Amino acid sequence: MPITPRNIVRHELIGLECRVVKSLGPPYEGLEGRIVDETKNTLVLKTESGEKVIVKDQVLLELKLPSGERVRVDGALLVGRPEERLSKRIKYAEVVRGRFDPEDYLD
């Protein structure tokens, strides 16, 4: 099954290009790189300056899908291991509307 904006929360994230659009906590904003590892609460990004660990529930992420499409996702929806996220019931509206300002979800 291909990764789409509608099913991104249920997919494996390792290998996807990622950019931190907004951060509620530490200064993650602006970090860009490829996701190389994932735990229940964190993502590890390989950036030009090395690997950076970011806390999922503190950020708004922009993920580049294999199709080239970009989607913004509230990191709080990604908390949990990929196999745990499969059983979560998440509505698509939650993916495109989260805790951040609506303008943050637009390009």
UniProtKB/Swiss-Prot annotation:
- MF annotations from Gene Ontology: ribonuclease P activity; RNA binding
| Entry annotated with the keyword Nuclease | yes
Keywords from the named record:
Cytoplasm, Endonuclease, Hydrolase, Nuclease, tRNA processing
Extract the Pfam families matched here: RNase_P-MRP_p29
Q: Which SMART domains match?
A: POP4
The protein's location, in the record's own words, is: Cytoplasm
Q: Identify the domain of life.
A: Archaea
Outline what the protein does: Part of ribonuclease P, a protein complex that generates mature tRNA molecules by cleaving their 5'-ends.
Q: What is its EC number?
A: 3.1.26.5
Its Gene Ontology cellular component terms are: cytoplasm; ribonuclease P complex
Q: How does it assemble?
A: Consists of a catalytic RNA component and at least 4-5 protein subunits.
Q: Which InterPro entries match?
A: RNase_P/MRP_Rpp29_sf (IPR036980), RNP1 (IPR023538), Rof/RNase_P-like (IPR023534), Rpp29/RNP1 (IPR002730)
Family, similarity comment: Belongs to the eukaryotic/archaeal RNase P protein component 1 family.
Q: Which organism is it from?
A: Methanopyrus kandleri (strain AV19 / DSM 6324 / JCM 9639 / NBRC 100938)
Q: Any one Gene Ontology biological process term? A: tRNA 5'-leader removal
Q: Where are the transmembrane segments?
A: none
Catalytic activity, as annotated: Endonucleolytic cleavage of RNA, removing 5'-extranucleotides from tRNA precursor
* UniProt-recorded name of the protein: Ribonuclease P protein component 1
Q: Which segments does the entry list as coiled coil?
A: none
